[in-house]
From Swiss-Prot:
Protein origin, superkingdom: Bacteria
Skewed-composition ranges (Basic and acidic residues): 77-90
Sequence similarity: Belongs to the UPF0229 family.
NCBIfam families the UniProt entry points to: PRK05325.1-2, PRK05325.1-3
Protein name: UPF0229 protein NT01EI_1636
Region of interest called Disordered, as start-end residue ranges on this chain: 40-111
Gly residues bias locations: 92-107
UniProt xrefs under InterPro entries: UPF0229
């Protein structure tokens, strides 16, 4: 009876290793496809993966084949029209097909390659090369980052990570184990043959039998493969959580009457993207949500994204509340403080200079990074004009403009592109 042993470690995902190698090989094309996809779908729609399209030309492999010219020697079935060594003229152009459709005037081609990536793969590509700017590693407490480290060996992987020494050690151990009993038996038979050859009288038949058994055993030992897939070992790498400085992100959103529903929706999408980025890359980071119209209020996540409350516009109320919360709960000596403010830029005229003053004197000296996102299809408003001077003077202040939903992801990547961490 024959037994089949499945040594694959991937279970149902039998091509997981090949899949990861494919994702690494065509990373730039896949990232471009994901960037295009985020413009078509809702930012909050991350429960499913994404269909990724790669142009066929990008995955084509070099191919050696015979050219269209030259002289070839071939053997064809014989018939009554040709005899050996006849020269057959090559047909010019392609042959006619048997289909009934009309011919087109374009060149033939192949469809682009389309495949599905999972939710985790989608988010990994979405947030790759992004990080909190100016993160200072000065107080090891709650925030956890993940870094790649060597983690021993694994039985599957890519050829580039193969460990030759460990694989040969496993091969030697396996061959020794599989042939140990046969070698002991071979040693006994060789001793018997040696004793028989020195004994009287000579027994030729027994000598022949022992030599045949010895030869059979040697062949069986030689058939043990030198290397087997079960011997292969690959250097393993894993992402380990590493403690680093604790951080807090302040999310300030304008919900005044000047913010129409479409503008509020774009602001929510930006903050949802920010929330996904923080929760996926930083395990224990704290997030403070502040909504404001004429008055500012600290709210929870549910109320921040879904409350219908609205009113007039006094942006400074949110900045004052943020300043109060920082001084009450988040010591800048122990916390990395970040803020993201989203607004349509429409503010009470006398309040915009006060906002600039609050940022300059109270908030920017305390925060690692402050970003302002103005969401409007109109010309820039008073708040933008007041903030422009800050962006030129302060390295930890950034401004971006969102006009359409398609701008959300490019603006997000621009604001949170990975930088060298401060020490």
């Amino acid at each position: 009876m024959a037994y089949f042993i499945d040594r694959r470690l991937n279970g149902k995902n039998k091509s997981a290793v090949n899949r990861q190698r494919f994702l690494r090989r065509y990373k730039s094309q896949i990232k471009q496809s994901v960037a295009d996809a985020i413009r078509r779908r809702s930012v909050s729609d991350v429960e499913s993966g994404e269909s990724v399209t790669i142009p066929r030309d990008d995955i084509s492999e070099p191919l050696f084949h015979q050219g269209s010219g030259g002289e070839r020697h071939r053997v064809h079935p014989g018939n009554d029209h040709f005899v050996p060594h006849d020269h057959i003229e090559r047909q010019q152009g392609g042959g006619a097909g048997g289909g009934s459709g009309d011919a087109g005037n374009g060149e033939g081609g192949e469809d682009d390659f389309v495949f599905q990536i999972s939710k985790d793969e989608y988010l990994d590509l979405l947030f790759e090369d992004l990080a909190l700017p100016n993160l200072r590693h000065n107080h090891y407490q709650q925030l956890t980052e993940f870094k790649t480290h060597r983690a021993g060996y694994t039985a599957n992987g890519v050829p580039a990570n193969i460990s030759v020494v460990r694989s040969l050690q496993n091969s030697l151990a396996r061959r020794s184990a599989m042939s140990a009993a046969k070698r002991r038996e071979l040693h006994q038979l060789e001793q018997q043959l040696d004793a028989l050859q020195h004994s009287e009288p000579v027994q030729p038949l027994e000598t022949i039998r022992l030599r045949q058994e010895i030869e059979t055993l040697r062949q069986r030992i030689a058939r043990v493969p030198f290397i087997d897939s079960i011997d292969l070992r690959y250097k393993n790498y894993e992402r380990r959580p590493e403690p680093s400085s604790q951080a807090v992100m302040f999310c300030l959103m304008d919900v005044s009457g000047s913010m129409d529903q479409a503008t509020k929706e774009m602001a929510k999408r930006f903050y949802i993207l920010l929330y996904l980025f923080l929760s996926r890359n930083y395990k224990n980071i704290e997030v403070v949500y502040i909504r404001h119209h004429t008055q500012a209020k600290e709210v929870d996540e549910q109320e921040f994204f879904y409350s219908q409350e609205t009113g007039g516009t006094i942006v400074s109320s949110a900045l004052k509340l943020m300043d109060e919360i920082i001084r009450a709960r988040y010591d800048p000596a122990q916390w990395n403080i970040y803020a993201a403010q989203a607004s349509d830029g429409d503010n009470w005229a006398d309040d915009s200079p006060l906002c600039q003053q609050l940022l300059t004197t109270r908030l920017l000296p305390l925060v690692r990074y402050y970003c302002y996102i103005e969401i409007t299809r109109r010309a820039h408003q008073t708040l933008w004009r007041e903030y422009e001077g800050l962006s030129q003077r302060c390295d930890n202040f950034a401004m971006q403009h969102i006009r359409e939903p398609q701008d959300i992801y490019p603006v997000f990547r621009e604001l949170f592109a990975r930088q060298v961490a401060l020490r």
